[in-house]
Every structure is written in C-alpha cells, then in structure tokens.
Amino acid sequence: MAEEDLRRTRLEKAEQWRVHNQNPYPYRYERTHMAGDLQAKYKDLENGQEVEDAVSVAGRIVARRVLGSVAFFGLQDDSGTIQLYFDKKRIRESMGADAFKWLDKLTDTGDFIGAHGTIRRTERGELSVYVHEYELLCKSILPLPSEYYGLTDVQKRYRQRYLDLIANPGVRETFRKRALIVREIRRFLDERGFLEIETPVLQTEAGGAAARPFTTHHNALGLDMFLRIATELHLKRLVVGGFEKVYELGRIFRNEGISTRHNPEFTTVEIYEAYSDYFDIMDLVETLLRAVAHIVLGSTELVCEGNTIDLGAPFRRITMFDLVAQMTGVALAGLRDGEKAARLAEAVGVEVTAGASVGQILYQLFEEKCEAKLTQPTFVLDYPVEISPLAKAHRSVPNMVERFELYINGRETADGFSELNDPVDQRARLEAQAKAKAAGDLEAHPFDEDFLTAIEHGLPPTGGVGIGIDRLVMLLTDSPSIRDVIAFPTLRPEAGE
C-alpha cells in the first residue's frame, strides 16, 4: 500500500476512535513502571509463572500480532522493550464487549499505548504484562521503519533522526553515551575547582582559531556580527579578570567543509588554568580522558574502527620535529633554509607552495605523512609559530611555540598551549595575521584590539586546551562519522524542503 493510502487509512482509524468516544490523543497517562525496570526486577521469574503485582506501562507499539482471541504487542519505551499480552476474554470483562475488536482493528505499529495489568512470563520465556486495561495514547498517521525492514539509507537516517532512533537501538545508545560523556567532563572539572562561565556566541570579532566564520547582522545595532569560532579569547579575558580555573562546554560554528570529521556546528570544551603551562595541561587532559572512558565504558581500553586503543597507558609525547623525522626521514630541526626544506619534502612526495617557511613545511609534512598513523594516544609537541598565533614562544626552541595536539586513532582530539601572555608579542603576531587576512587568507586571525587591551592589563602564566566533544564521542562509541554522534547534523536541504 502506498504511503498516502496508509496515511488515509490511519486517519480514518483515528476518527473511528472518536466515534467510539475515545480521544486518540489524550493528555496524560499514569505510568508506574518502565519496561527496562520490569525486565530487571523480574529477571528470575520462571516460565509460566505469574505474579499479581499491578503495573502500568506506556510506550510505542513496535511489534504487533493478533491471533484470534489473543494478541501480542511489543512495547518500547525509553528504557527498553516488554511484551504486552492481551486476552480477549479478560479485555472484554474489564473494558467492554468491543474493546478487543478496537485493539485489533484500530491500532497499528507506531501507535503509543498505555497498558495496565499484571506480570507473567510466558511458557516460551517472554516477560509480559498480562493486560487488563489499555488506552490508546497517540495514533500514528505515518508508518514507521522497523529494525529489520526499514531504515538503512544513511542520508534518510540523518535527515529523519527520529525514525533512526526508533528503528536502531544502537543509535539511541550512542546519544545516551554522549550525554554521559558531557556530564562526566563537567563533573571532573567542577570537582577540581573549575568554574563554567558562558561566553558570547555572537561576536564582533571571530577569533581564537584559524577558521572562516559565519556572518550575520544585528538589525537594532546596524552591526555585522559573527558566530563564534572558539571560546578562547573571552575565557582568557576571564582569567585576566581573576577567574583562575575556568571552562566552557558549548557550540562552535565554522563556515568550512563537511566531512566524516567536520560539521559546521560542533561542540568543544575549552579549559584554562592560571599558573600552568602546556605540560600541566597535558597531564590534565590525559587524566580527564582516562576518567571519562572508565565511567562511560567501564574500561580504559577500547576498540575504534578495528583498532584496540589503550587510554590507561601513559600517552606518548613527541615533538613534531622528531615525529616527522621518524616517520618520513626528513630532519628539519635547526634548518633555516625554506628552499632546502622544500626539496627534502618534495623528495618524500609532499608538494610545497613556493616561498613556504621551514615551519609551514614541517607542518605540511606532519599533516600529510604522520597524522593519520597516530593510532595510540599521542601528544605531538612544539608547533611552528607561523600557524600558532596565540601560543607562547617556546622557552628553548627558536621559531616554535609551546603547543600540543593530542591524536587518537588518527584524529586530532585536543589542542592546547602555554598561552601567549606577552602583549607586545601578541600584538605583533595579530598584526601579521591581519596582513595575511588582507592578502586573502580567509582563515587568518582577526586583529582584536579589545583582547590586546585585556592582556595588557596582565594575563598570568596560563595553560589552556580545547577538546573536541564530537570526536571524543566518536572514539568512545566507535562511530566512523561525526554525523553519527550529532543528533541533527548539517545537511543540504532536499528539493522541496
């Protein structure tokens, strides 16, 4: 039957409920138990055994069989599933002569139903509610996909996530774990004295990252504004103001490409601690990820995309110079000649832009030849100053900064610094970024005079980090695409939407 015909038939059934003086969309239902709780409470009930405990359950009908004078419905709620067993004689005695007929003729898979009865385990071992009375709670008008026959089209799963959640229990579990991960990160930080403070989403300067922002316009102020690309600069202002341990977990927006690792709207947690450096922050990140994995998975060992990853062992720490030398044979440490560095890179198959500096070439070698191979947790340390305008100059290595990125399973998971607090150096770097922006670099950092004014009042030695929540969820749920861990990912509208 075509979908429109099914829709028409179900609308007619809804009207039939009204004819029988039954509202197919009542206002509430008094539920006493969840399906999962009943499954746990009566797990030891033997086959054929019944108890007189009265229960009321409610949920969606996900399976349905009517066999003469008995009916078996599968009911799904937020905690799991349980079978409803209807006996025609019992229903007629409790609800009237036509009640079983209405159940048979006027309900469908996808409807919501409430059922009151007692608990029994069938001879075949299925825990069931032996229904004495039922109530239709919502008549569904469109048919739903089933776990077995329905939703396999990936794009439809993302576009109609509500159907995906109904049809695929594993998807619901992913989002439960995501919520737990977020909760545990906040708990971890709160217990260590960090304070979460919200910073603006609408900004007059979109700074804190190398990214292209989304633009909007404030009508009342007559002002072009941007959606934030990071929370960094406002959180540092808070450190200037006296908050020594501060963080924010929230949405970030970047007007960039979409891939299995990138969504224009995503979630990060940024953390800043005064009187710390990037070594302290690496310790914090390592402890945090280990604690979250233990709570969410019950273990610090996990499997992601076929790779066994150990978060319990000390995370590897290696400089970018050393990593590139180990993986490519190209040793750039101490080299100042960009042309020579370019020849060395091209010898291993990396095409370099004319005029690139040694630092830019080093980073390109890392991205193209090393990044994807970092399966076990690895802190890559000490980045070129050219690509890190907000990180503090390295205390001993010229032209490098005290920056790290954490890679797990070939993905960047965290990015942290010893934060640049020298206002003269910071001004010079932002001026260089402004020149690059004027020359056409859309991802160059904007010149933010207010931020410079803030740190001229004094930013204490500070360590900071941003952790990608979506990628962390991908890791801990073994999800291959970022769209699998964002409830409603960004998609191009279909024709007619």
UniProtKB/Swiss-Prot annotation:
Q: Where is this gene product found?
A: Cytoplasm
Q: Does the keyword Aminoacyl-tRNA synthetase apply?
A: yes
One GO process term, biological-process aspect: lysyl-tRNA aminoacylation
Q: Which reaction does it catalyse?
A: tRNA(Lys) + L-lysine + ATP = L-lysyl-tRNA(Lys) + AMP + diphosphate
PANTHER family recorded for this chain? LYSINE--TRNA LIGASE, CHLOROPLASTIC_MITOCHONDRIAL, LYSYL-TRNA SYNTHETASE
Instruction: Provide the primary localization.
Output: cytoplasm
Assembly information from the UniProt record: Homodimer.
Q: Which Gene3D superfamilies match?
A: Bira Bifunctional Protein, Domain 2 (3.30.930.10), Nucleic acid-binding proteins (2.40.50.140)
Known EC number(s)? 6.1.1.6
What InterPro entries does the annotation carry? Aa-tRNA-synt_II, aa-tRNA-synth_II, aa-tRNA-synth_II/BPL/LPL, Lys-tRNA-ligase_II, Lys-tRNA-ligase_II_N, Lys-tRNA-synth_II_C, NA-bd_OB-fold, NA-bd_OB_tRNA
Concerning HAMAP family, the annotation shows:
Lys_tRNA_synth_class2
Cofactor info, note text: Binds 3 Mg(2+) ions per subunit.
Q: Which family does it belong to?
A: Belongs to the class-II aminoacyl-tRNA synthetase family.
The entry marks the following residues as binding Mg(2+) 1, namely 405, 412
Write down the required cofactor(s). Answer: Mg(2+)
Q: What class of enzyme is it?
A: ligase
Protein name, please? Lysine--tRNA ligase
Q: Alphabetically list the UniProt keywords.
A: Aminoacyl-tRNA synthetase, ATP-binding, Cytoplasm, Ligase, Magnesium, Metal-binding, Nucleotide-binding, Protein biosynthesis
The source's superkingdom equals Bacteria
A GO cellular component annotation here is: cytoplasm
Where does the chain bind Mg(2+) 2?
A: 412
